[in-house]
Every structure is written in structure tokens, then in C-alpha cells.
Regions:
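Amphipathic alpha-helical segments that mediate coupling or scaffolding at interfaces
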Residues: 15, 28, 44-45, 56-57, ...
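Short helix-loop junctions at transmembrane helix boundaries
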Residues: 18, 68-84, 144-162
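Transmembrane alpha-helices and their membrane-interface boundaries in multi-pass membrane transporters
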Residues: 90, 94-104, 126-145, 154-187
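Juxtamembrane "pre-transmembrane" interface segments
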Residues: 1-42, 142, 149, 153
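Residue-level signature of catalytic and energy-coupling elements of molecular machines
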Residues: 25, 40, 57, 61, ...
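Hydrophobic transmembrane alpha-helices and their membrane-interface caps
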Residues: 39-46, 50-106, 164
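Helix-loop junctions and hydrophobic alpha-helical segments within the transmembrane domains
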Residues: 15, 22, 26, 101, ...
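Internal alpha-helical transmembrane segments of multi-pass membrane proteins, especially GPCRs
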Residues: 26-34, 58, 83-86, 122, ...
């Protein structure tokens, strides 16, 4: 379309095919994501039993999948910047779940019934987990609103993506993680 408007002595060539670059980066992201999940499982398995490590590790892919879905619903396209934001947040999305699982194990060790332990592990830690999540979100979010011009257009998706992923991580930790603990970690 552009070639029709331009004079005949002007050439238009494709330098970078953005969808191709994003597809390649998406592949790299999933490789890094797999490595991160394996590292989380390995580290947690050193400290906790296999089932506990598995529940903590499930939180990451669930959070990332829901984050991708929300980004899609909001019309935020997958591009290099949003992928970079997902890589930035990758290690953070399991933290909340690990804390809830650890608290659940403590409660069960104190002879509290499984259902009560699951409920208490989420409700007692809601404020501290929310505060920690909010602190991280508030450290990224100003980038979306304080920058102007081309810089804003380029960078604004990092804080938005990070904020969505951390909010999803918070919800997964408070709702899904205790439920999985109750069903899979009975003594």
C-alpha cells in the first residue's frame, strides 16, 4: 500500500518482521519458563517434600496462563516488551504460593485439620502477601504513567504486564494454592 503512494525511485524493504521476532522470543520465553519452573521445583524440593514442591510449582504456569488470557482480553498484544515483562516477573509469581504452602504445612504440623489449615493459611497471610505484592506493583506502575512520548509507548507495557501477573499470582496463592494443599497434602 505504501509503495503505491511513494515515487517510483523510492524503495521500501522489510528490515524486521516483528511477528517473526515475537514468535522466536516466545519460544525462548517458554524455554526460560521451563528452566525457571525446574529451578523452583529443585530448590523447593531441597527444603520441602515433593508434593509441596509440586503445588508451589503449579502456581507459576497457572499464573502465567491466566496473565496471558487477561492480556489478550484487554487487547494487549504479545510483543517483545510484554514478553520481557513476563520474564522479569517469572521468578516473582511463585513466591506467594510458596509462602501459603509453607504456612499450610506449619498448620497441619500443629494438628489443625486440613480444611481449617488451608483456610487459615490463606486468610492469615492475606495482608502480608497483599502488601508485598502491592509494593512491587507500585514500584513498577509509575513507569506507565510518568513517561511520555515514544519512551512511554515502548515501556508502558512492562509495568502493566508485571502488575497483572502479580495480581493474578496473589489470587492464585490465596484461592488455588490452599485448595490444592487441602486436596493433595493430607497427613
Amino acid at each position: 500500500e505504501v509503495k503505491e503512494i511513494l515515487p517510483s525511485d523510492v524503495q521500501v524493504n522489510t528490515i524486521v518482521d516483528q511477528p517473526e521476532v515475537v514468535d522466536m522470543n516466545l519460544g525462548h520465553f517458554f524455554i526460560e519458563f521451563g528452566i525457571a519452573i525446574a529451578a523452583v521445583i529443585l530448590v523447593v524440593m531441597l527444603l520441602l517434600p515433593f508434593r509441596v514442591a509440586t503445588i508451589s510449582a503449579i502456581a507459576a504456569p497457572v499464573t502465567i496462563a491466566v496473565t496471558f488470557a487477561i492480556l489478550n482480553l484487554l487487547g494487549i498484544e504479545m510483543h517483545q516488551v510484554s514478553l520481557a515483562a513476563m520474564i522479569i516477573v517469572l521468578g516473582m509469581v511463585v513466591d506467594d504460593a510458596i509462602i501459603v504452602v509453607d504456612n499450610y504445612i506449619e498448620k497441619v504440623d500443629e494438628k489443625i485439620p486440613s480444611w481449617t489449615a488451608a483456610w487459615q493459611s490463606a486468610t492469615q497471610l492475606m495482608v502480608p502477601i497483599f502488601t508485598a505484592t502491592l509494593t512491587i506493583v507500585l514500584s513498577f506502575l509509575p513507569l506507565a504513567f510518568t513517561l511520555t512520548g515514544l519512551t512511554r509507548e515502548f515501556v508502558q507495557w512492562i509495568p502493566i504486564t508485571v502488575s497483572i501477573a502479580l495480581a493474578v499470582s496473589f489470587l492464585v496463592a490465596l484461592f488455588l494454592t490452599p485448595y490444592m494443599c487441602y486436596h493433595f497434602l493430607k497427613k
